[in-house]
Amino acid sequence: MPTVKEVTFNLLRKLGITNIVGNPGSTEETFLKNFPEDFDYVMALQEASVVGIADGLSQGLRKPVIVNVHTGAGLGNAMGNLLTAYLNKTPLIITAGQQTREMLLMEPFLTNIDATQLPKPWVKWAYQPARAEDVPGAFLRAYATAIQEPAGPVFLSLPLDDWDKEMSFETPVRSVSTRKGPDPDCLKTFANKLNAARNPVLIYGGDIARAGANAWANGVAFAERLNAAVWDAPFCERTPFP
């Protein structure tokens, strides 16, 4: 039977998530053992750099990137840039190793105590699977949660002995919609008010930069159609206008 690790990596392949940035330790060794050649693992010297690299990479690729840090200490080091990724609405899947399940009761060295509390409130969802068999499903939910608007980081705490456990089933991939749109009636009212304005001003936010390749061009065309000045929203996390 396949292992939890094999099922998880197969799932990640189907989701198109093959980029990982990390600064691992002993609690991540089982995840890294026999690492598949079709995945890219970028190692950085400190966890703040790890999250910063992953944030930029995810924005550039326009898809989630996995972050791999070392139990509670590594996650603590990552918190500053995790806050930034949250404000950037970047879909990162943050993973941290955890002590073996059979030892967690005694809280030995390297145990991440209250693991799901540490990254809050700067993640959309935090979870430690109840069983080894739940690890692939946890990744699927993490993916879905991270990419749905407003996008943002999520966190998984993963006991180090889970990866080599056997699984009797594959985790099916489900489709996840990220589309969002305004209410048609509200949009009509908004358009009428804009058309009636004598000196309109547009304030663009980071959603334009996240919306895809045509969003900038559409933003420019909209401003030109109205002959309107354009301003960035205060403390905008991404550049919305060229």
Where are the language model's segments positioned?
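N-terminal alpha/beta PP-like core and its mobile active-site loop of ThDP/TPP-dependent enzymes
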Residues: M1-P242
